[in-house]
Every structure is written in structure tokens, then in C-alpha cells.
């Protein structure tokens, strides 16, 4: 069963605000299923957004648990967040945390084509640093690059209430 956002008033639908969350978040948490166990890894990422279609790129070692799991079951759940700050109150129930986040489901594809890997790593580095980098086949041959085709995502935000801003 698919569920929607419980707190609809926190849903973010404005594309500029969604892009801001993607730009400010530095880490994507990627959840997978390893047999009958959940498995989660935090990773740096790059992204493209074309016509509302979100694609993420991550990289890492060419072997290990993450690669083994994704070869068996490429379905993933992603989460990223930013703008984390405490919200204080006079009563315990008034405390909370402000945030902006994106969550979604997708399919991970382990890239094999050197050209596609070079392009993906360039996107990742541009997202993370704002700078352009070039890669060659030798460099991409020693790293795995994973593309996550995000099928569905939602964005939410809970800003600090105006009266509590410092």
C-alpha cells in the first residue's frame, strides 16, 4: 500500500523549493533490502532534474555489500534533508525540529559504460562542489557509479515559526 504525506500543510510542491533542497542537502540516505534485513547507506550524490524527473548519481567501491545488494534487488528508498534546527517552546509539546526533506522510491542501476560513468561523476562533483571536473576512462574504471532513477518522491518542510526565529 502506498501512503501519501500525513501533514499536507508541510508538503513542498514548488520546483524551485525542491531544487533548493536538492542543492542544500549533501547526503542521500539509500535504503535497500538485503535478504530479509534492511540496509542503509549515507552517500554524497549528484542529481539532474529534467521535466520533474529526478535522477541521482552516487559512487563508491566496485565491490562490497551495497553492490551485492543492488545486484540482487535494485529497488531503493531515498531520503535527504537540510535546514535542520531545533524549535524551542515553553512546553515540552512545543519543542520540535525544523527541516526540509525529500523522500522517494526508485531503481538503482550500476553503470558500466565509461562515458556514462564520466558524465555521472561530473554531475556528482558539480552538485557537491559547484565546480566542473573532467574524468577519464582510467579513473572511472576503479570506481562503481550508480544511477538512481527516482520513480516517485515527495518534499516536505517545517520552517521555524516566525515568532521563534532568532
Predicted feature residues:
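Short, basic/aromatic recognition patches
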Residues: 1-29
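Helix-adjacent hinge/juxtasegments
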Residues: 65-88, 95
Amino acid at each position: 500500500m502506498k501512503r501519501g504525506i500525513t501533514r499536507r500543510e508541510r508538503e513542498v510542491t514548488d520546483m524551485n523549493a525542491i531544487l533548493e533542497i536538492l542543492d542544500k542537502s549533501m547526503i542521500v540516505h539509500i535504503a535497500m533490502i538485503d535478504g530479509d534485513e534492511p540496509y542503509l547507506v549515507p552517500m554524497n550524490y549528484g542529481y539532474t532534474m529534467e521535466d520533474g524527473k529526478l535522477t541521482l548519481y552516487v559512487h563508491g567501491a566496485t565491490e562490497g555489500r551495497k553492490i551485492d545488494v543492488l545486484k540482487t534487488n535494485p529497488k531503493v528508498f531515498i531520503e535527504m534533508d537540510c535546514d535542520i534546527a531545533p524549535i524551542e517552546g515553553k512546553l515540552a509539546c512545543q519543542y520540535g525540529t525544523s527541516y526540509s526533506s525529500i523522500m522517494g522510491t526508485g531503481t538503482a542501476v550500476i553503470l558500466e559504460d565509461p562515458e556514462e560513468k564520466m558524465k555521472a561523476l561530473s554531475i556528482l562533483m558539480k552538485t557537491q562542489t559547484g565546480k566542473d571536473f573532467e574524468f577519464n576512462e582510467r579513473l572511472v574504471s576503479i570506481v562503481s557509479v550508480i544511477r538512481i532513477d527516482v520513480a516517485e518522491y515527495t518534499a516536505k518542510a517545517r520552517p521555524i515559526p516566525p515568532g521563534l526565529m532568532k
